A protein has these predicted regions:
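Bacterial N-terminal signal peptides
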Residues: 10-19
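Structural signature of tandem-repeat unit edges
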Residues: 45-51, 73-87, 97-109, 119-133, ...
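Leucine-rich solenoid repeat scaffolds
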Residues: 288, 377-448
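Sec-dependent signal peptide cleavage junction
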Residues: 19-27
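Short acidic/polar inter-strand loop motif in beta-rich domains
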Residues: 528-537
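Transition segment at domain starts
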Residues: 26-30, 449-474
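Consensus positions within tandem repeat domains that build extended binding/scaffold surfaces
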Residues: 89-92, 111-116, 135-138, 159-162, ...
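Bacterial N-terminal signal peptides that target proteins for export
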Residues: 1-9
Length: 547
């Protein structure tokens, strides 16, 4: 009997020891060669102590959560990484509902997916100066409500999508020493996901002088404001790098160190008012500067550029573009609907104009095509808006090129245009070419879409009705009335809001116009004279200067 009681007592003690051991193992344990974890359920605090690197916690599809603290995931509110820990393991704290993360002062590496989708963080997140590497997807989808992100001075590597879809305020400063922003490092998809968990970074963006490469989608769709200063030394800006960052303002000035600007790089950056391109470019990529609706100054495309890509400046609103002498090809839709362009000079050496390249533009001067042109695409100038009526057309300096869009079949030009050619150039035979009317020209006189009509009726100073016609040279500002008018003939000029001449003609009725100015024997008239500005550029009417 005594022996039996002894056995029962031993079994009870063993069971008690096992229970105590199991309880202790459940709230603490090892998580690295010399790293340990403990969870305090009363405060919801998970603490990583010890030293060195943590183990990686790599999830396998269908397997249980490999993290030793997996039983407490929903209870963890605070994560504290001890000062002697050097590496945070892969996926260690992903998808926690914690509100606070404190990273120890000797951590050097934050592993892949370490804090991915921690959407309940509040306050400020500080990455200490000891951290040199933030691996890919480390903070992907994490939200810092009403808080800021501070990146430590020792940081050198920011991995692919490290902070994608993060949300925090107060701006972002990338520390000196970082040479590359990896693909999608700070990208936001909130615009397309519709999820508030997919946040944006707000405030200013400061880039380091050490930066060399800005990866694809690096800052795409973010909510930055202020000016964007790209440091001298950056050589590559990846595709979509700043796409739809419409909060930036001022002039976007790309340093001459930049050799490559990827497709869609600054697509729909509507806040920029100016654009300076680097001297080292050889191609303007597809949609790289499209939909920059805020542009207000001329864009000069640098010498050395041979090709302007598809939609490169589509729907951007710069008032003028300067094309380089090295340009060979303008791809489809490159300048489609750039409504503020009033004129463009196509350089000698240009060979190809793609489909819809200038579709919907509103030039006020005639199009002159250099002798080098070999091909003009479908609807290249279709939808071209002009002011007034008359013999409108394109003026060719060389042989007849391939015109892909024939009349009434994806027209390359508006159907009422005439194609003017220089006598002696090849390919221009008969009365039509590609279905369009053709006619010779002298190489100088052009219809420039400034006149409301080519002839008109008016009144001389004695009340006699007269008829006249005219020609215009907009390069010199001289208008020539081709008929010998009586002394004192009345001439009317109309203006746009900026004081540019939009039409010139002879008066139909005396009472409909108000005298604005009188020079010698010619009178200058203007409709709605009370709101009319003065001319920006003087014009000459039959050698009488009008200002």
């Amino acid at each position: 009997m005594k022996k039996h009681l002894t056995r029962l007592l031993f079994a009870a003690l063993l069971l008690l020891a096992l229970c105590i051991g199991a309880s202790a193992a459940g709230t603490s344990g090892k998580c690295g060669p010399s790293a340990y974890w403990s969870f305090d359920s009363s405060t919801g605090t998970l603490t990583i102590s010890g030293s060195g690197a943590m183990n990686d916690c790599v999830f396998q599809w269908g397997d249980p959560d490999p993290r030793p603290w997996s039983a407490y995931l929903s209870e963890i509110k605070t994560v504290v990484i001890g000062d002697s820990i050097t590496k945070i393991g892969k996926e260690s704290f992903s998808s926690l509902s914690c509100t606070t993360v404190r990273i120890g002062k000797n951590v050097q590496v934050i592993g892949e997916n370490a804090f991915m989708n921690c959407t309940s963080l509040t306050g400020d997140l500080v990455i200490p100066d000891s951290v040199t590497t933030i691996d890919r997807w480390a903070f992907f989808g994490s939200v810092i409500s009403n808080g800021t992100l501070t990146l430590g001075k020792g940081l050198r590597t920011i991995g692919e999508r490290a902070f994608t879809d993060c949300s925090f305020s107060g701006g972002l400063t990338i520390p000196e020493g970082v040479t590359e922003i990896a693909e999608g490092a700070f990208c936001s998809s909130s615009k397309y996901s519709g999820s508030p968990a997919h946040g944006k970074i707000t405030g200013t963006l400061t880039l380091p002088s050490t930066l060399k490469t800005i990866g694809a989608y690096a800052f795409a769709y973010e909510g930055f404001s202020g000016e964007l200063l790209i440091p001298d030394g950056v050589t590559c800006i990846g595709a979509n790098a700043f796409a739809e960052c419409d909060g930036f303002g001022g002039t976007l000035s790309l340093p001459d160190s930049v050799k490559t600007v990827g497709e869609w790089a600054f697509y729909q950056c509507e806040g920029f008012t100016g654009l300076k391109l680097p001297a080292g470019l050889t191609k303007i990529e597809k949609l790289s500067f499209a939909f920059m609706a805020g542009l207000k100054t001329e864009v000069a495309i640098p010498e050395g550029v041979t090709e302007i890509g598809e939609g490169a400046f589509e729907c951007s609103y710069m008032p003028s573009v300067r094309l380089p002498s090295t340009l060979k090809k303008i791809e489809k839709q490159a300048f489609m609907h750039t409504h503020n362009l009033t004129k463009i000079t196509l350089p000698d050496g240009l060979e190809t104009i793609g489909d819809e390249a200038f579709d919907g533009c509103r030039f006020k001067k005639a199009i002159v095509l250099p002798a080098s042109i070999k091909s003009i695409g479908k609807k290249a100038f279709y939808g071209y808006s002009y002011y007034g009526s008359g013999t409108l057309g394109a003026y060719f300096l060389g042989a007849a090129p391939q015109i892909v869009g024939t009349l009434n079949a994806n027209c390359s030009f508006p159907s009422d245009w005439t194609l003017f050619y220089l006598p002696g150039t090849s390919g221009w035979t008969g009365d039509t070419y590609a279905g369009y009317k053709i006619a010779p020209w002298d190489g100088e006189t052009r219809w420039d879409n400034l006149l409301t009509r080519e002839f008109g009726y008016g009144w001389d100073n004695k009340g006699n009705e007269i008829e006249t016609s005219w020609s215009v040279n907009t390069d010199t500002g001289k208008v020539t009335l081709t008929d010998d008018l009586n002394e004192g003939c009345v001439v009317a000029v109309s203006y746009d809001a900026e004081g540019r001449v939009t039409s010139i003609g002879v008066l139909r009725t005396k009472k409909d116009f108000v005298i604005l100015n009188l020079q010698d024997t010619c009178r200058l008239f203007l409709l709605n004279a009370s709101s009319a500005p003065r001319l920006n550029t003087p014009i000459t009417i039959n050698d009488y200067l009008q200002t």
